[in-house]
Amino acid sequence: MARLVGVDLPRDKRLEVALTYIYGVGRTRAADTLKATGISPDLRVKDLGDAEIVALRDHLEGNYKIEGDLRREVAADIRRKVEIGSYEGLRHRRGLPVRGQRTKTNARTRKGPKRTVAGKKKAGRK
């Protein structure tokens, strides 16, 4: 496995796909990086030379916020919204969806497993 900015890239994948294992690098950014460094996207990670790895690392670290820096920035943005008391911060604090999704049904990923509420009974048929 080639190690790039603290991430082990899978050896047998194409470079364009393997770069997406880095937090903050998707398919578009991976393609742009390969075009800027002049490396073929069809190349496998195991076929990379040391010079190409250095070129990729320099380009990624020099032009983009990735991995730890990006994670810290996102966490700081959320913390700031919570501290200033914005609506988004309130939703983060309560563990609810932030971007306006419905919560009457769904939203289970954010809310967690269902909690049964005592006292609710179904109306009986007469």
Curated annotation (Swiss-Prot):
InterPro entries: Rbsml_uS13_C (IPR027437), Ribosomal_uS13 (IPR001892), Ribosomal_uS13-like_H2TH (IPR010979), Ribosomal_uS13_bac-type (IPR019980), Ribosomal_uS13_CS (IPR018269). The gene is rpsM. One of its GO terms (cellular component) is small ribosomal subunit. This is Small ribosomal subunit protein uS13. It comes from Beutenbergia cavernae (strain ATCC BAA-8 / DSM 12333 / CCUG 43141 / JCM 11478 / NBRC 16432 / NCIMB 13614 / HKI 0122). One of its GO terms (molecular function) is rRNA binding. One of its GO terms (biological process) is translation. Located at the top of the head of the 30S subunit, it contacts several helices of the 16S rRNA. In the 70S ribosome it contacts the 23S rRNA (bridge B1a) and protein L5 of the 50S subunit (bridge B1b), connecting the 2 subunits; these bridges are implicated in subunit movement. Contacts the tRNAs in the A and P-sites. Residues 93-126 are annotated as: Disordered.
